[in-house]
């Protein structure tokens, strides 16, 4: 199965993540706390917590910080009670956006999200207005040059749902959300280390944007991601920023 070119977008995403690394710990602490509250403190029995801990390890979060977040979630330590919110809307060229938040103040959050949309050429929609276009799945991306047949065999044996070769030669392994961490670990044990990966809401129909439209869309995404209550921003936009 063939896919679009992902390589440039991955590199661009990594550059933006590095620039925002100061906020990553705060978001991870929130996610670990909520994951532990919802599913318990054992990552072996809690896929959401296991994913959050994988991200914490990748970002070199101190173990004491991680344990405190788990303890706050399980009630062993006092902590803030966060609620989960999802907002949907439209960006440049009608591109779909989904914005996941963890907050202790819903009124503040919706006002901030609406302002970011409005100020940057988008508009906040109603619940369900774009959700139909997204599917919840995990993915792992491997550099061009990896033995596709061997990787496919290892991935499918590990429980992956699909393996996609992108136009630029990179290879993408698709998983069910709860299987992502297990597939990643199995492939690493077999000698395959991914260069990107996550559990995401992926658009089934994409919107290609280039030139000024791509720049404006990136500005909208950045404005949303910069909000303290925002955890993740998903979009149908494919940005050609070169």
Curated annotation (Swiss-Prot):
Disulphide bridges, residue numbers: none
UniProt entry tagged with the keyword DNA-binding: yes
Cellular compartments per GO CC: cytosol
Single Gene Ontology BP annotation: regulation of DNA-templated transcription
Pfam families per record: TACO1_YebC_N, Transcrip_reg
Keywords, alphabetical: Cytoplasm, DNA-binding, Transcription, Transcription regulation
Gene Ontology molecular functions: DNA binding
SUPFAM superfamilies linked to this entry: YebC-like
Compartmental location: Cytoplasm
HAMAP family membership: Transcrip_reg_TACO1
Family: Belongs to the TACO1 family.
Name listed for the protein in its UniProt record: Probable transcriptional regulatory protein NMC1563
Record lineage: Bacteria, Pseudomonadati, Pseudomonadota, Betaproteobacteria, Neisseriales
């Amino acid at each position: 199965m063939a896919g679009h070119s992902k390589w440039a977008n991955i590199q661009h995403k990594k550059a933006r993540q590095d620039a925002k690394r100061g906020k990553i710990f705060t978001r991870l602490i929130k996610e670990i706390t909520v994951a532990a509250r919802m599913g318990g403190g054992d990552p072996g029995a809690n896929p959401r917590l296991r994913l959050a801990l994988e991200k914490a390890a990748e970002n070199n979060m101190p173990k004491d910080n991680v344990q405190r977040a788990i303890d706050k979630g399980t009630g062993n330590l006092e902590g803030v009670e966060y609620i989960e919110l999802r907002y949907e809307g439209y960006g440049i060229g009608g591109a779909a956006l989904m914005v996941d938040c963890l907050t202790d103040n819903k009124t503040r959050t919706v006002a901030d999200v609406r302002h970011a949309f409005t100020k940057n050429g988008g508009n906040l929609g109603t619940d369900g207005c774009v959700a139909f276009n997204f599917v919840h799945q995990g993915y792992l991306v491997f550099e061009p040059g990896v033995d596709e047949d061997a990787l496919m065999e290892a991935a499918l044996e590990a429980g992956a749902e699909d393996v996609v070769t992108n136009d630029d030669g990179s290879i993408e392994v698709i998983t069910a959300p709860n299987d992502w961490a297990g597939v990643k670990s199995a492939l690493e044990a077999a000698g395959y280390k991914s260069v990107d990966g996550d559990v995401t809401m992926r658009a089934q129909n994409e919107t290609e944007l280039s030139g000024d439209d791509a720049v404006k869309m990136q500005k909208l995404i950045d404005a949303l991601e910069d909000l303290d209550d925002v955890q993740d921003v998903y979009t149908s936009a494919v940005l050609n920023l070169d």
